[in-house]
């Protein structure tokens, strides 16, 4: 068992030149330095095949932090972070390079954490190289980014490869959505407040929507994205994890095992979508050209390096049913896409209306109560409720009002970025916010039949939608068939 404490570490970043490292990891490490959460003896070792020395690497790191940090660099903090930085040239297909890396790591007795910020097709070379020189021994840890593979079969292959060299307790599969403050607060919201705890079921809740909307396109990731599509990249990866947190039963305790057990129960309770339902419960789209933030943007098949005949989806929405007592009859509507009208992610819990409302005589089409949990931007919680319109009228006119709690405004000093939190948790050896092998594979078991169903039926085509809109009409039809509507961004 890994000891859960903040110990001196050697953080080895494979792929330190890449987009993930520059945009997310390096700014997160700066913030951890700022909050004094990094052990004084911790080292950060960037690796790659770039023709750099450590001084070159230091300049690259500072440039990345300046570009992607949402605040001005404090030179005192930078000086501390800079002192930790080292660069090591490595070709992961060369065994000799791992021996040289071992010599560097043996200079200190720090716990080693490997962060694989690289494509999954290079994972096995890293696992094998580390294993050959015994750099995989306990209590070293390894962090890998989801999604793992493109199917259950390929995911199992990656998991089998890493299991040859690392114990499950050493493996930290990262899903950055699980590090968001609003997702973590969802556990507190649900299980520590009686009015939510007793209302979180099919007697009180009508339906739940989960939306992850992106303004960006594929961002020069054609080769990666075209083999993945939005379903593999986002639904299997992020939205199903959000769904499990929203819907799981109360865990026995707040341990990694306690939380994972309940999440697994949900994944195993997801109702499979049959071939005869697939056109009713799913919708796919691909972005056409359009206008985003006042600028014209190309269609998916006009992107650099694109296959003009590609049918890969950049948008997907799915109606999900959970086969258990708590959620029987409560649909979950998921949607996610690229080049949509706004960038935002949120969970919408819509409560059932009162069957015989006392004020219905004076009010037609009363809005339902809603709880909206905004994940990004500006993480917040909003509660919508009905309130009397002030005035002297004898009629009881009602309107929908809201109460809002904004994490950024109310907790400015304590607000923590997702990658900042997840890196810190990995340094402490706490796996609660990371995904176990069974979760990954159960998610693929549910997703694979949907993707295969699209191939088997005559709906293996995608509807085009204009960039800057909310996706194809078929997405609206999924929810409108049930007499419901997507909650619009505001």
UniProtKB/Swiss-Prot annotation:
Family the entry assigns: Belongs to the glucose-6-phosphate dehydrogenase family.
**Alphabetical list of InterPro entries matching this protein:** G6P_DH, G6P_DH_AS, G6P_DH_C, G6P_DH_NAD-bd, NAD(P)-bd_dom_sf
**GO cellular component, as recorded:** cytosol
Which SUPFAM superfamilies does the annotation name?
Glyceraldehyde-3-phosphate dehydrogenase-like, C-terminal domain, NAD(P)-binding Rossmann-fold domains
Q: Which residues cross the membrane?
A: none
Query: Which domain of life does the protein's organism represent?
Result: Bacteria
Q: Which PANTHER family match?
A: GLUCOSE-6-PHOSPHATE 1-DEHYDROGENASE, GLUCOSE-6-PHOSPHATE 1-DEHYDROGENASE G6PD
By which gene is this protein encoded? zwf
Active site (record annotation): 238
Q: Which GO terms describe its molecular function?
A: glucose-6-phosphate dehydrogenase activity; NADP binding
Where is substrate annotated to bind? 176, 180, 214, 233, 338, 343
For this chain, the annotated S-S bridges are none
State the reactions this protein catalyses. Answer: D-glucose 6-phosphate + NADP(+) = 6-phospho-D-glucono-1,5-lactone + NADPH + H(+)
Listed binding positions for NADP(+) are 49, 91-92, 146
Name of the protein in question: Glucose-6-phosphate 1-dehydrogenase
Q: What is its EC number?
A: 1.1.1.49
Species this protein is from = Buchnera aphidicola subsp. Schizaphis graminum (strain Sg)
